[in-house]
Structures are given as structure tokens and as C-alpha cells.
Amino acid sequence: MKFVGAHVSAAGGVDQAVIRAHELKATAFALFTKNQRQWHAPHLAADVIDKFKENCERYGYGSRQILPHDSYLINLGHPESEALEKSRLAFIDEMQRCEQLGIDLLNFHPGSHLNKVDVDKCLARIAESINIALNKTQRVTAVIENTAGQGTNLGFKFEHLAAIIDGVEDKNRVGVCIDTCHAFAAGYDLRTNDVCEQTFQQFEKIVGFQYLCGMHLNDAKSEFASRVDRHHSLGEGNIGKTPFSYIMKDARFDGIPLILETINPDIWPQEIAWLKLQQN
């Protein structure tokens, strides 16, 4: 079974995000559990936590149908110790918020070397950051998102994801989220069924589908292998609709949240409905 949704607003409280997802006829959703552009946020109030859980139960969202995203400020591979510690503490807080809400997944961008440390050292530092967070929390899986490779961001090669996973002690609590726009921009072609198969065979060989915990379904304004992260609506960009139909028909993508981050929220209901139709 496919779980399809979008990254919805949590304005007015995280409990409101659940209602917005339901209004889209989504069977999965993503959200920020705090302001994604600030380091600090108030603790989640007990009544808001209760309402979030009640709404999830009412509308049928299980703990692995929700894929929250952490703050954009966090860099778990930061080359400077003070900034790294700040990121690690913020990431632990994000994991704890998921724990409180009964969510089993936390999606994050792995980190950036900022041209101050080599790639392997940065990847090892990211894995160490994940280990620290997992040791201070329970149940929540750290879900590494592939990146487009813009700037000094790591995670744009499947080998980067595999190296991070290799350094994580508890393999049961680490996974990956594949963003189609990021993959395309990083040089993994998705424009035909044949190249989709080749790309996902590569993924299976290097990372493994057992680690796939979610996907971001986005077309791309950016060019193939451009290392530029620019999302577009499904079928409107340089990828086209083929891979999204491919994903919806392939059982390897069952049982995980498939999340739209496309640029026009007004057409999310139509995009979700179209994706669901592709299963037939």
C-alpha cells in the first residue's frame, strides 16, 4: 500500500498539520515540529501533543506515515566544534519532539563540509552525530535525505548515504529518504522507466531498499546533473511524470511516506489524486 501526501503547514500548532493533510485526502504527510529557521522553540504543550495524537488516530495516520523534517540550520557534519555541538543539541531536541508526538521518523539533510574538512571526515562526523542523538532518544529513526549537492552539501551520492549508515551503530534506527529532484540534479536519471530501473538498482546495490523510509516526490526546475536544488510541480519540470508513475506501481516503495514538496500547494489535491490513480 502506498502512503501519499505533502509537506503541510503546522501554523497554529502541529495538531493543525494533521487536519490539513486530511483535507488534501493525503494518506501521509510531512511537517516541521518547530520553526525551521530558528534554533530555539517553545516546548510542545501537553494539550497540543494530545490533540496531535487524537487527530492522527481520527484520520488514520500511523507513526510511520508521518515524515517530519528538522531545522534547516542544523549541520551534523559541521567542521567547527562549537557550531557542531549547537547542531547536535538541536537535532536531539528535534528527535525528542518526535518522541513526544509518537512519530517514528525524522528526516534531515546530512550536512556540509564548508570547504574546511575533507568529505570522508565530514561523513564520519555526521554518523557520530547520529549515534549521539540515537543514544539520547528511543524508537525514532534518523532518516538521511539525499541532496542535490548544492554548495558543499554532502549526501548527493548514494555512496555518501552508505558511508553514513556504515558509521551508525544502531542500524535499526537509521534510514534514508530519496528526493527525486535532488537525485536528478545530482546526476541520477529518472526520465524513463529504463533509467529509473538502473538508478534504483544502483540504490539497492550501494545502500539497500531495507533502509528506504520515505521519499520526496518532486519534479525539477534544475537541469540534469546540475547540482542545483529547484523543485517543480509534477510533470512541469525536467524530469516529467514517468518516474512518479513508476514509483507508484513498484512494490519496493510500499508502506513508506511519499511526500510532495512541489511548488504549488493549490494543486496538491490533484497531484495526490493523480499519484493514487497510477497504482491501477
UniProtKB/Swiss-Prot annotation:
Which top-level enzyme class is recorded in the Swiss-Prot or TrEMBL entry? hydrolase
Per the UniProt record, which EC number(s) apply here?
3.1.21.2
On cofactor binding, the record's note says: Binds 3 Zn(2+) ions.
Keywords attached to this Swiss-Prot or TrEMBL record, sorted alphabetically, are: DNA damage, DNA repair, Endonuclease, Hydrolase, Metal-binding, Nuclease, Zinc
Quote the function comment for this protein.
Endonuclease IV plays a role in DNA repair. It cleaves phosphodiester bonds at apurinic or apyrimidinic (AP) sites, generating a 3'-hydroxyl group and a 5'-terminal sugar phosphate.
Q: What is this protein called?
A: Probable endonuclease 4
- Would I find Protein biosynthesis among this entry's keywords? no
User: What's its catalytic activity?
Assistant: Endonucleolytic cleavage to 5'-phosphooligonucleotide end-products
Q: Which GO terms describe its molecular function?
A: deoxyribonuclease IV (phage-T4-induced) activity; DNA binding; DNA-(apurinic or apyrimidinic site) endonuclease activity; phosphoric diester hydrolase activity; zinc ion binding
Q: Which cofactor does it need?
A: Zn(2+)
Q: Does the keyword Metal-binding apply?
A: yes
Q: Which PROSITE patterns match?
A: AP_NUCLEASE_F2_1, AP_NUCLEASE_F2_2, AP_NUCLEASE_F2_3, AP_NUCLEASE_F2_4
Q: Which domain of life is it from?
A: Bacteria
Quote the Pfam families the UniProt record gives: AP_endonuc_2 (PF01261)
The Gene Ontology biological process annotation of the record reads: base-excision repair
Q: Which InterPro entries match?
A: AP_endonuc_2, AP_endonuc_F2_Zn_BS, Xyl_isomerase-like_sf, Xyl_isomerase-like_TIM-brl
Which residues of this UniProt protein bind Zn(2+) 1?
Answer: 69, 109, 145
What HAMAP family does this protein's entry cite? Nfo
Family from the record:
Belongs to the AP endonuclease 2 family.
What's the source species for this entry?
Answer: Photorhabdus laumondii subsp. laumondii (strain DSM 15139 / CIP 105565 / TT01) (Photorhabdus luminescens subsp. laumondii)
Q: Which residues of this UniProt protein bind Zn(2+) 3?
A: 182, 229, 231
Which NCBIfam families does the record match to this protein?
nfo, PRK01060.1-4
Q: Where does Zn(2+) 2 bind?
A: 145, 179, 216, 261
